[in-house]
């Protein structure tokens, strides 16, 4: 049996794919940088070998799966090609692998990871399901009927897939280092829609998704009355959210989610619509929604003394807004303190004003230095340019986070897609 060697095994897609192959009995190993990345924990729990990058890792008989961050000139990839071994890019391999299952791709500018996690949790209670979530979680299940995956629009990677179903949560301008504008983003989603084989579940409250054309049925969900699946009578409190679902204006059932913010109602609606389409029993859906514990780096909470510390991946103005909204729903009596690390110079430059407006929704704002991507050079932009647009915003350094102790009884939200967790860990050490 071939050994699958992953070049960049700690990637947020690569790690779960390695987990899935391992769970299905394949021989798996990989290489990556030696710095700790949270995605390696699940690999280590399965005793999947992780090696430092070295051409000597490449042995005869291997199949090499290459992460997208690594060019063909990477020493391991060059060695594999020189020895005539199969070298397959992550998305191409996954696109072929999906064809064995009823595949459900979850895509959209925001909400992909949470919706993928929620759908996986619910639908696996109905039928055996394998899943790949962009928080580094993967699970291969023997005799799987469904395969649920997070599919990202960045660099049009999701066009490697021809899924049976697609959930489309929203279309928004992001990844300005690749997409020219919102029309370019829409074009990518429109192309994706034409590759879906059975049906599309799309948010009908999104003006761009309403324009999608497809060769399969498009089922719309949302708060507006025109949607096929509509949430009504939404009740938000500190324990979570309850809402009624109407299917084409006929009452279906009442659902409860232990989650906060309107965006989580929409994520749940997408899952309800897909499961209804696949004739999953409503009691299974209700139980799954109630017992979902969330995904990594999405509103992950811990209590420290009088404070609540939240770790969240929010790195776009829209995401910051809904994360602060969720915190206000759960903790209406507390101050909200945003500790934000912008991710990439291009994104920060493109959305400078929007970042400022979204962060102003917090009571206090602390800004970390911009986290640059490996793909870009630092421009002239500095974190001071964002600070100028937010009255009373302060800069914070990883080596001195003690100022945060001043905010007694507050909710501190550490947000970003870079290494914002370093700041959270540093602050926890101050408190220890």
UniProtKB/Swiss-Prot annotation:
GO terms for molecular function: ATP binding; UDP-N-acetylmuramate-L-alanine ligase activity. Keywords: ATP-binding, Cell cycle, Cell division, Cell shape, Cell wall biogenesis/degradation, Cytoplasm, Ligase, Nucleotide-binding, Peptidoglycan synthesis. It holds the Pfam family Mur_ligase_C. It catalyses: UDP-N-acetyl-alpha-D-muramate + L-alanine + ATP = UDP-N-acetyl-alpha-D-muramoyl-L-alanine + ADP + phosphate + H(+). ATP binds at residues 108-114. Its EC number is 6.3.2.8. One of its GO terms (cellular component) is cytoplasm. It comes from the Bacteria. It is found in: Cytoplasm. Its main location: cytoplasm. GO terms for biological process: cell division; cell wall organization; peptidoglycan biosynthetic process; regulation of cell shape. InterPro entries: Mur-like_cat_sf, Mur_ligase_C, Mur_ligase_C_dom_sf, Mur_ligase_cen, Mur_ligase_N, MurCDEF_pg_biosynth, UDP-N-AcMur_Ala_ligase_MurC. It is an enzyme of class 6 (ligase). Pathway: Cell wall biogenesis; peptidoglycan biosynthesis. Cell wall formation. Belongs to the MurCDEF family. This is UDP-N-acetylmuramate--L-alanine ligase. It comes from Bacillus licheniformis (strain ATCC 14580 / DSM 13 / JCM 2505 / CCUG 7422 / NBRC 12200 / NCIMB 9375 / NCTC 10341 / NRRL NRS-1264 / Gibson 46).
């Amino acid at each position: 049996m071939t050994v699958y060697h992953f070049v960049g095994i700690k990637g947020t897609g690569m790690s779960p794919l390695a987990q899935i192959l391992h769970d299905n009995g394949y021989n798996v190993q990989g290489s990556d940088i030696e710095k700790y990345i949270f995605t390696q924990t699940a690999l280590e729990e399965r005793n999947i070998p992780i090696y430092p990058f070295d051409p000597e890792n490449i042995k005869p008989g291997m199949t090499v799966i290459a992460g997208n961050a690594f060019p063909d000139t990477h020493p391991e990839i060059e060695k594999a090609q020189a020895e005539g071994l199969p070298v397959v890019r992550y998305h191409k391999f996954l696109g072929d692998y999906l064809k064995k299952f009823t595949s459900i791709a979850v895509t959209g500018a925001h909400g992909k990871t949470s919706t993928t996690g929620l759908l996986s949790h619910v639908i696996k209670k109905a039928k055996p399901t394998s899943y790949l979530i962009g928080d580094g979680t993967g699970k291969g299940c023997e005799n799987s009927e469904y395969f649920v995956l997070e599919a990202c629009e960045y660099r049009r990677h999701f066009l490697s897939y021809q899924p049976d179903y697609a959930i489309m949560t929203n279309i928004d301008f992001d990844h300005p280092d690749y997409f020219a504008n919102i029309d370019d983003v829409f074009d990518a989603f429109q192309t994706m829609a034409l590759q879906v084989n059975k049906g599309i579940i799309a948010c009908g409250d999104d003006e761009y998704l309403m324009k999608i054309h497809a060769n399969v049925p498009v089922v719309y969900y949302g708060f507006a009355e025109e949607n096929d699946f509509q949430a009504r009578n939404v009740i938000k409190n500190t324990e979570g959210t309850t809402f009624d679902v109407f299917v084409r204006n006929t009452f279906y059932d009442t659902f409860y989610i232990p989650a906060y913010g309107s965006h989580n109602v929409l994520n749940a609606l997408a899952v309800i619509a897909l499961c209804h389409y696949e004739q999953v029993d409503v009691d299974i859906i209700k139980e799954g929604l109630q017992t979902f514990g969330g995904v990594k780096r999405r509103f992950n909470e811990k209590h420290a003394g009088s404070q609540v510390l939240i770790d969240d991946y929010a790195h776009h103005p829209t995401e910051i807004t809904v994360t602060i909204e969720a915190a206000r729903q759960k903790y209406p009596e507390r101050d909200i303190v945003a500790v934000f690390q912008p991710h990439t110079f291009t994104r920060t430059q493109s959305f400078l004003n929007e970042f400022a407006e979204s962060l102003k929704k917090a009571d206090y704002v602390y800004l970390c230095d911009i986290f640059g991507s490996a793909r870009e050079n630092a421009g002239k932009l500095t974190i001071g340019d964002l600070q100028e647009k937010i009255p009373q915003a302060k800069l914070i350094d990883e080596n001195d986070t003690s100022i945060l102790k001043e905010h007694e009884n507050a909710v501190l939200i550490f947000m970003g897609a870079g290494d914002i967790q370093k700041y959270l860990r540093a602050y926890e050490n101050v408190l220890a």
